[in-house]
Amino acid sequence: MSKIRVLSVDDSALMRQIMTEIINSHSDMEMVATAPDPLVARDLIKKFNPDVLTLDVEMPRMDGLDFLEKLMRLRPMPVVMVSSLTGKGSEVTLRALELGAIDFVTKPQLGIREGMLAYSEMIAEKVRTAARARIAAHKPMAAPATLKAGPLLSSEKLIAIGASTGGTEAIRHVLQPLPLSSPAVIITQHMPPGFTRSFAERLNKLCQISVKEAEDGERVLPGHAYIAPGDKHMELARSGANYQIKIHDGPPVNRHRPSVDVLFHSVAKHAGRNAVGVILTGMGNDGAAGMLAMYQAGAWTIAQNEASCVVFGMPREAINMGGVSEVVDLSQVSQQMLAKISAGQAIRI
């Protein structure tokens, strides 16, 4: 089997050296070239035809976003962004994902060499995932038209969504058409701390419903979406007749915190047939067992189809476990969620 060919673009010679060490330490990949800026990278891409590009967000001569935008228009390829953990860095990274980057890794703020080498396995996994990603499915998407929701039967209805690689754009596409009369939406997207708040704020500006980073103990309200904070698990809980959010530091599940399985299992327990579950693009199997639990509890469950996924991992696993009611294209997910929950069809007979 041929190795994954990687090209790294970073203005820091140290970062280029570290990325080369990391990539070449894995037997299934190799660093074919490195570039100090996008202009040099342009020529190296033509020369080496890499499978995956790692790209620093902030560089001289041409910044990473400008280069990414041109690259995705002229020569689409899998890109993993390398970002700082600053507030500005998180906003720029989210814009990069919108432009078509597959995923991102964050630079440690102190001890770059030790920090990056500690991330070695995670970086390699993101490169592997990017190499398998469906680039055609990751073209920037126009804002969908607002849908109309039928009358909610009760405030007990809610929607739970889980996603990973490619999920930030998929979630935007699902939330943007939702009207103010939508039921509550609770979302777990695999994302490190420092990024989920920026992600929620970005969505809040784009959506009619209110979108925020979830807080422990807050009441779950219709017309609102709640994003699990990075490096924290989020669960649905009950407080009398109301739903409540529970945030905690439990151990990683399926190597993830937040974990989609943790969210879905809690929704199965506390909402059951009053819920609709949605599993979107992502690598691995997180959420598959939780979706099966939701299905067995009477929830209607939706998986994104392979053609519209960046990575058809999590949806495939959920389908294979037998916990999916229907498989639909990303463009139809919002409509199906509202149709099932508004008509009371979250209850399966």
From Swiss-Prot:
Alphabetically sorted, this entry's keywords are: Chemotaxis, Cytoplasm, Hydrolase, Phosphoprotein
Q: Which residues carry this modification: 4-aspartylphosphate?
A: 56
Q: Which residues form the CheB-type methylesterase domain?
A: 152-344
The UniProt family comment states: Belongs to the CheB family.
Q: Does the keyword field hold Phosphoprotein?
A: yes
Give the enzyme class: hydrolase
Q: Where in the cell is it found?
A: Cytoplasm
Gene3D superfamilies to which the protein is assigned, alphabetical? 3.40.50.2300, Methylesterase CheB, C-terminal domain
Q: To which species is this protein native?
A: Salmonella choleraesuis (strain SC-B67)
**CDD domains per the UniProt record, alphabetical:** CheB_like, REC_CheB-like
User: Which Gene Ontology BP annotations are present?
Assistant: chemotaxis
> What's one GO MF term for it?
protein-glutamate methylesterase activity
User: What protein name does the entry list?
Assistant: Protein-glutamate methylesterase/protein-glutamine glutaminase
Looking up InterPro entries in the UniProt record yields: CheB-like, CheB_C, CheY-like_superfamily, Sig_transdc_resp-reg_Me-estase, Sig_transdc_resp-reg_receiver
Where in this chain does the record put each Response regulatory domain? Answer: 5-122
